Amino acid sequence: MSAIPSENASQSNQYGASSIQILEGLEAVRKRPGMYIGDTSDGTGLHHLVFEVLDNSIDESLAGHCTEIHVTIHSDNSISITDNGRGIPTGIKWDDKHEPKRSAAEIVMTELHAGGKFDQNSYKVSGGLHGVGVSCVNALSKKLKLTVRRDGKQHFMEFERGIPQHRKIELQDGVEISPIKVVGDTDKRGTEVHFWADEEIFNHIEFHYDILAKRIRELSFLNNGVHIRLTDQRTGKEESFAFEGGTRGFVEYINKSKSVLHPNIFQATGERLSEQNTTISVDVSMQWNDTFNEQVLCFTNNIPQRDGGTHLTGLRAAMTRVINKYIEEHDFAKKAKVEISGDDMREGLTCVLSVKVPEPKFSSQTKDKLVSSEVRGPVEEVVAKTLTDYLMERPNDAKIICGKIVEAARAREAARKARELTRRKGVMDGLGLSAKLADCQEKDPALCELYIVEGDSAGGSAKQGRDRKFQAILPLRGKVLNVEKARFEKMLSSEQITTLIATLGTSIGADEFNIDKLRYHRIIIMTDADVDGAHIRTLLLTLLYRQMPLLVERGHVYIAQPPLYKVKHGKDERYLKDDLEEAGYMMQIALNDAALVPTENGTPISGDALSELVRKYNTANAIIKRLSRAIDDAALSAIMTGVTLNLDTTEAAEQSAAALSAEVNDPSVEVSVSSDALSARHLLRIARRHHGNLKVSVIDAEFVHGPDYGVLAEAAATFKGLIGPGAVVRRGSGEKMRESAIADFHQAMGWLRDEAERNVSKQRYKGLGEMNPEQLWETTMDPTVRRLLKVQIEDAIAADQIFTTLMGDDVEPRRAFIELNAL
């Protein structure tokens, strides 16, 4: 354990209360949250809250003070970020104009533009320059808990919608102060921020694991020496991110599922003085692969810029100048009789560009574009020099890269000719609409839907079953061309693809695509639930993702969800989406006329009371099933049978471990008390040995104080002692009554399910062709009852790798992916 820095450290590199500078208040954040964290309706702003706190921990890492970060999505959809950095300063800021004078930690959490990032003695480079990050998170959270471990003490403060709670005013030297509460001693250090997003601000407060994992992966690659752990308590999923290699390792990771053209990754690193006499650090890596797509990721002080900026401009200028010069000197273009453009150089390029800039300037608080003009020159200089040397020293790699660029120029020229030909035929601008298209009457694209269906037979049913006012049907016969393996000119020679392009009306290609001409704002892929249908759906998604990504990004693409079951019970006939819905409906039938007699001569339980028992039982079992991937299911079942857990003290934790072990009663399971390395809180460690393999799971204080544990404990209180001697479950009345003796509630549930199956007929659908037009409308096309899945890309790198794996040339990665993910 490293020494804990004191609040009264020496002036050099001091990070104490005096480092915190206040610039203005927080008032506008809740009124206009979009100005600070982005859109509050589509999830970007919600996840930006996490990134703001995470960036603070990464800044501690950049300053050399943090090596461990733990991000946890709790079962109640709250988020905690814990690090082992220096901890936010906790001393009283005596130059605070506020009365009473507050601790530096409170100021950081409640004042806009307050932080240590404006003083270069505290942080040389930082992503959190604006100083609005963590205070914005506080303002936009219905509740936030701050724990600071610093100077041997553990401090705690709680906020509600940015307002400090339980504040204590003290008098020191005749001055009123409001110190942060000390809750104990500790030998640890660091900051923990645990917040609950405010439903009054955000339309949805459900955090997506993949979005967080994408950002954490980026940070891990860009910051050697920091270990980041991401845990999702809702599903039990957990990953550790500790990548090495910087931008070179990042490029290698992105290209791992692709066929690279040259084994040696180009990397340029260096530092240059800017016009403002500040040091700018540049790290860029590039490698070409055999695909036709450019993938360039830009970062400034670890913050991603999806819109690029001056650093990307410098990179492209250097590439164009150096590569053009090399191609001219070696007559590559002259021999091929083509002219090279910048787009040709970037076809198949994977590039990660990272710069470290003191006081960077961004276009907005979301930092999507770097606008610091002084960055372009250093990037261009570092890349130009290193790329010139790379091409000269590795002639084989240079020849391969230039060959790829020349081939891209040839293909661009061929695509131009093909585009002109198809434009003359009216395909690119939608004039040559297919005769198979059954168009709708509505002319407003925002109200129109296009169903892309598999084959003429399904198309016929869909055409008859649709509402022709706003629903158009386009049947596609056979397999769509796999665009992952095809060049642009080959795509334009495919009848199915040109038909789809003409129908959508947007054209295709980087220069021609125009989303404003989209004729249907809902594009619904409707294929069978069999293997062929899944393949066609994947081919269509590949086409849309690779060639028309804006359709996906703007939420225009959907997948139809036809029902899996048709169930008939007496005169009642209904369609059910999946196995879960079918199980719920069957239990509803089972409870009709059912009664539970818990003991001999006991009072029967029926109606709403029995339904409530079933609901509690099913809810508790669903939690056990969901959490069993993270926590041993025998331990969870023990909680449901009545074991009470308490981890507040060492003695209570040891008693809980003993009780849990006794209830599980399995010699292959060992329950012991442990503690979390960062928070020093007690944990229960459950080790199960099965056929020589050891599986370890953990129960922590967050789980014990969380809603899932509460549901299991409530179920335990309900069912413990409910079923006694002579208990029976029955259904019906009079001569038609049937009953069975039971030993526990689980047995009663099984008997009721079996009874429900007796008078029900079920049909399981395999494809759309099994439905007539009326059924297709009722189940899949009627907007009032249908279910649609919106296609969204949360992790672009992961999506890119999945498309490459599934649709690329390599068989082994595809086989491994299918084996891992097959049901």
Q: Model-predicted segments: where are they?
A:
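Conserved phosphate-chemistry cores used by DNA topoisomerases
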Residues: S2-L823
